[in-house]
């Protein structure tokens, strides 16, 4: 068939196999009229366009079949076709939905200008274009992409050079298909021209390419938010949702949570105050079951505490992160097997008040007391309710002479950074407790900087890696609920980092280097975690499904757990600066 392009001032020619042009009269009445049968059904289709409509129907059928085979079948349910009676354009828009782009509306004032395409010289092999990525295989490992790469030219005058392409087109997959009606015409699918010869290429969704555009749009939206360009940010956050649906696995989930955080910040629909602590504890339990991060945190902290308690007859653990008490059965069993018999074990569990008037901390202590009786460990427990760790004072904890004290905190101290002077008060109270060991586990990330865009970029990389590790855990269908609830657990953190400010932003994670500086200035010295902890942590990961992707790393006496090359959590141990050094095993080495 032939496709005619009509210009109001110049005669138009249609591309033909012989390359000859055909002159057309400017009078539209001389063109073929509307097809009467389709007109009765409400569709305005010229008889001369029937072949083109048939071709688009064939293309749409082939794209749907191929997309279903790839597991990528989708249509944007929110798309509005303003004139569905225009059957040709309607089919074209449906085809474009299978390959969504941020610039789907070419006249969108919020997006950068698109370089004009040369349809006269186009070929099935698009020319190579520069990419800001340093590797063609992304594996969804996000790179630092400045938001300016997308819309830095939006405010520029029209005479400025067009913005560079947002993604490489050389990765687009083409599947040749034959058709009896496929003549030598130019088909425009997915926004760029492809000449059809005897075989007509059909553009399929390229998840990697769309993923690149998705990252660009996320970064651009975050920069628009920082610049308080809310009109642009609103347009971009809608595009994020449109692009995310074409992604599979971790990328789609991460983008969805970040889009929610951005939307809440744009529309000022801030998340409700932190959920009931018991529900948050349940989410963390699912996270504990799904992946090894909390297991690693508990194991490495327990190992440091066990070594500090060596030879002590009366020991006292003060736990800033009691939750469900999952950390302590393993330590109690290790103490029960200690040569010479177990010590007298006292545990003070600190937690927030419950909103349902239940004594949650008492229930946890009762279960631990039952275990202690079973393994013949003398056990004493006290649950201590506190609205904030910053409200603690050493005198409240009934410290006793002759006790060896250990203070433990897992994912708790970073929230104190939202309260001015909070972390300083807690560290001062810890010093007054005169502990033999302080164990701290925190996220290895910097989500507490003053610049929103920097926090957004860092958190996007961090949580993308975390979600990738969840996908790589090899979770069985039986544990699907654990995985889903773990994603909710991480999604709440994302929303807090992105949407909230001031005291409501409590997910203020900092790096190990930052914690080292803070604890050093507060009067604490680091205690090396020995090679025994390193080896046993590595063995723990070897037993965990999907453990091939996890890596234990020693960092100046501290232990880190990460996914592939990215550290995600860090365990460190500390003692008072004026205390003699604790005996330690050989420093870890990997």
Swiss-Prot record:
**Motif LXXLL motif per record, residues:** 413-417
How does it get modified post-translation? Phosphorylated. Ubiquitinated. Upon GA application it is ubiquitinated, leading to its subsequent degradation.
Q: What InterPro entries does the record tag this protein with?
A: DELLA_N_sf, TF_DELLA_N, TF_GRAS
Name assigned to this protein: DELLA protein GAI1
Annotated region Leucine repeat II (LRII): the residues are 363-395
Q: Where is this region: Disordered?
A: 1-28, 153-182
Its cellular-component GO annotations read: nucleus
Q: Where is this motif: VHIID?
A: 315-319
According to its UniProt record, what is one Pfam family this protein matches? GRAS
What role does it play? Probable transcriptional regulator that acts as a repressor of the gibberellin (GA) signaling pathway. Probably acts by participating in large multiprotein complexes that repress transcription of GA-inducible genes. Upon GA application, it is degraded by the proteasome, allowing the GA signaling pathway.
Task: List the Gene3D superfamilies hit by this protein, alphabetically.
Answer: Transcriptional regulator DELLA, N-terminal domain (1.10.10.1290)
